[in-house]
Amino acid sequence: MATVLRIDSSALSNGSHSKALADFFQTQWLEKHPTDSFQTLDLSQTPPPHLSEATIGAMFTPTEERSKEQTQQLALSTDYIEQLKKADVILISTPMYNFGIPSTLKAYLDHSLRVGETFVYTDKGPKGLLEGKKAIVVAASGGDYTQSPLDAMNFVTPYLKTALGFIGIEDVTLVEAPGMAGDEASINKSIKQAKQTLQNCL
């Protein structure tokens, strides 16, 4: 039985294309793998705080030297990391906000990319500790940033692929749904293509 960690980041509770595609994937996955389980983290409902000076200080304090207060400061970060470690598949759904990911998703990653927990530094450079996992990134955008020259403005999928690879998750499938601010025909075509890509991930 596999565990899928689903992370939604759209601020919209209704009308989110990225969440709708994640819903589609979850339904299709469970039909094919009925004994698997999904753990959902909706960052719009439980937004993580941005990193503080105290949190950063605790992160870089050796475990054996941390005070009780520092350990408590890292409680949310530790919870996120444990969820990632237990997951076999990570599903991230995100819109594009001003060329990048929502600040909630960035804050989540800031808490999750932690030295000694999800990556370490070696003589050969940084090494990710979450190898062997698969990630699927569903990214929706109002415009089409998949082709030149607008692809240079896309800081969503390149960043997420880099961040996931940094912690050892190299098997990343990018599912993009561009043109969500276009006409109905264009939207339907984009969603259909995204769903086909998602079905190929089952």
Swiss-Prot record:
Catalytic reaction list: 2 a quinone + NADH + H(+) = 2 a 1,4-benzosemiquinone + NAD(+); N,N-dimethyl-1,4-phenylenediamine + anthranilate + 2 NAD(+) = 2-(4-dimethylaminophenyl)diazenylbenzoate + 2 NADH + 2 H(+)
Highest taxon in the source lineage: Bacteria
Top class in the EC scheme: oxidoreductase
Coiled coil: none
UniProt remark on cofactor binding: Binds 1 FMN per subunit.
GO molecular function: electron transfer activity; FMN binding; oxidoreductase activity, acting on NAD(P)H as acceptor; oxidoreductase activity, acting on NAD(P)H, quinone or similar compound as acceptor
Oxidoreductase as UniProt keyword: yes
Record keyword S-adenosyl-L-methionine present: no
PANTHER family: FMN-DEPENDENT NADH-AZOREDUCTASE 1, FMN-DEPENDENT NADH:QUINONE OXIDOREDUCTASE
Subunit composition and interactions: Homodimer.
Protein name from the UniProt record: FMN-dependent NADH:quinone oxidoreductase
Native species: Hydrogenovibrio crunogenus (strain DSM 25203 / XCL-2) (Thiomicrospira crunogena)
